[in-house]
Amino acid sequence: MAAPRAGDLAAARWVPREGVDPAALAALLERAAAALATEGAVRKASRRKTLHAIALGDGVDHLLKANDYRDAPLLRRLRRSRSARELARASAAAARGVPTPVPVAAGELRRRGLLERCFLLVPLVPGAVDLERLRAERAHAPRERRACERALGALARRMHDAGVFQEDFAPNNFLWRADPPPRLWAIDFERVRLRAPLSRAARTLLLARLERRLADASGAARMRFLLAYADEDRAAARRWWLEVEARAPRLARRDRRRWQRTATHPSRRFAPMERAGWRGWARRDADPAALAGVLDGERVGEAAFLVRWLGRLSRRRAARAWGLAQMLWQRGGASPKPLALLRSSRGAALVFERPSGCQRLDTLADRRRLEPQLAIALDRLLRLGARPEALTADRLGAAAQGGRIWLLDPLVVSPGRRPPVEVHRRARECAARLAGTG
């Protein structure tokens, strides 16, 4: 998508949130247009959407969302824009008591009544970071992490009691600021529906969606979250735990089918690949020459990749493995980032981007100290449908220093498969076997 021009902001029709003075908004938009013309840094870009960091004061203090409708279907261009809907929903959610940074204003640029672009000006929360990034950086202290888990449970309950059904109920849509007093905000109301207080089935679905993104969360962390959600009622928290676990297999089956379909069709992220006797699928941000070179035995760039040989696979089974690898990486990082799955007469190979310090578990001399991390990771994999007997050391990767565990062979997972009875005990037994203590 082409970035919006400063003149587009002036030509758009703007609707401010309640309480914003139109004259003050006009002055704000003038400064936003000037900032966009000179230093509108693009934070995120896709085919129809861009996100710009805008400095209206000292430092970046606003985000400008821009959506392009010029190639959208006709009926969609006649309707109200996404930005207008998000402003209305965020304002309504805030009125129902949900803490959220309400957008300042929404703008629509139309030509002859047809929507061309829409804009949303959103204030930034100073010092706040989204939970996805917070988890990835792993820089917060245990006390802060526990406080964040409880705050997330309390906010989720507050949203559901207020009738806020957020389709993308995920860690990246929550902002956390640890500065006293610590606070949590909900953001991104583009895919929100407002209802009466949510039914138990709707709550279970949303909690299961959130839980699948928290692949490396321990059982204690999940229980702290559910206790806060259940208002410290331990019996109610256990019931929620069981209901969420029962819903998870259906979500996993749907995810696997969706990612297999997405990753095996040409798009802005994926493309078919055929090179030097290899054919399959790859991410567009991967270097085809480097991938083929590593598979053919060249050592150039080898340190950047991690290769898992899967033996001879039919095209259908290879597509399943490729989709599973994408799902496991996207859903909380249970696998490293998969770059390509390629087949040749030698067999099939899955190529990952090597995480920092990652080695195959069976190559590490001292595995005993990894037993606690193994138990947590294996518990999650068993819940995703992994077969306990198939979880061997050569199918797992580990960071020798950080203790992070990754699955390297996605075919040991069958999404939708019921986890074994006493899954915690089985995970601990597998961890002890792999660490050499059992």
How does the language model describe each region?
Residues 1-41, 240-295:
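Juxta-kinase regulatory segment immediately upstream of eukaryotic protein kinase catalytic domains
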Residues 28-131, 140, 151-162, 166-167, ...:
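Conserved ATP-binding subdomain of kinase catalytic cores across diverse folds
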Residues 75-78, 197-199, 312, 363-366, ...:
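Short, solvent-exposed loop/turn segments at secondary-structure boundaries
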Residues 113-118, 178-182, 346-348, 400-404:
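A short, glycine/Asx- and small/polar-enriched loop/turn
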Residues 126, 171, 191, 356, ...:
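Short, glycine/acidic-enriched loop or turn micro-motifs at the edges of active sites
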Residues 137-147, 364-370:
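Activation segment of protein kinase catalytic domains, centered on the conserved DFG
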Residues 169-176, 391-398:
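Hydrophobic residue at the +6 position relative to the catalytic HRD Asp in the kinase catalytic loop
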Residues 185-243, 386, 399-438:
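C-lobe/activation-segment region of protein kinase-like
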